[in-house]
């Protein structure tokens, strides 16, 4: 299935049905009075996060979603039928943006979560509603309320515990395939990975989800290479695993390139916890390892882990470091939720 993480959608809720002007007509009843029914409500447009979807590709082939109008009222106090609503089924992790692509209308992060995008119009009143002591035979009825028409954007941000970062050919896909059941495309050329991949990684009888995104290059925030739009898929991650190619002659510059792109992207991505690892050490001798590690640690300003996805050397240490950061993040979230509950005043 093709991957699509951004889609433009046109939606319109249904208009309400018109009220009816009608009078009771029965034998031997000379003054039957009004009996016009109300119009039905127009259908609303909803979005719902569902399980089993991981792409917005369906919205490439259908961009217009129009709910049904409510039917008009009828005589004998019969109300019109309500219009059928429409539900947009989206993957978990979908953000719904206004037409400006900046204003976030909703963020669906749980299965079954729903949000109302466009409310259907109310039905008009029939003439029965306008009967009074001074007007026993009203000949007026309300028109139905118009529906709401708008343009929205759907943007998918995959939900993972950890995200993989690095230049093209840093070994991210090989790492994911070595540590999980994911089978991303692997080849010895840049930009082998063209869309994000998810894998469930296990270590010490615990599991977490890791996302592999296409590699970044210098100037990605300006659209070079594949660009930086896939960085949105690691915004929700608790920790970022930054892989640096140990066979490169410029490991420090490679590391700085990715950090600069994170800072240019903005948001909280640059300040997220990071684990930095020097990859492909199976291709280096002891002297080359020490030299590359020293250069990278001087740039990072912190200890750097050594690993190889092929020989699996140091792999468990890297996974344990990532897992520790995930546990710390979950603990911080629980503490924040507990403090919010304490600050909430008691209500009877």
From Swiss-Prot:
Primary location class: cytoplasm
Organism listed in the record: Ruegeria sp. (strain TM1040) (Silicibacter sp.)
A GO molecular-function descriptor: magnesium ion binding
Binding sites annotated in the UniProt record for Mg(2+): 173, 193
Protein family (similarity comment): Belongs to the TRAFAC class OBG-HflX-like GTPase superfamily. OBG GTPase family.
Keywords for the protein's UniProt record, in alphabetical order: Cytoplasm, GTP-binding, Hydrolase, Magnesium, Metal-binding, Nucleotide-binding
Name recorded for this polypeptide: GTPase Obg
Enzyme class: hydrolase
Enzyme Commission (EC) number: 3.6.5.-
Domain of life: Bacteria
A GO CC term attached to the entry: cytoplasm
Keyword check for Magnesium: yes
Family annotation (PANTHER family): DEVELOPMENTALLY REGULATED GTP-BINDING PROTEIN-RELATED (PTHR11702), MITOCHONDRIAL RIBOSOME-ASSOCIATED GTPASE 2 (PTHR11702:SF31)
Segments forming domain Obg: 1-159
Known cofactor(s): Mg(2+)
Chain residues that bind GTP: 166-173, 191-195, 212-215, 279-282, 308-310
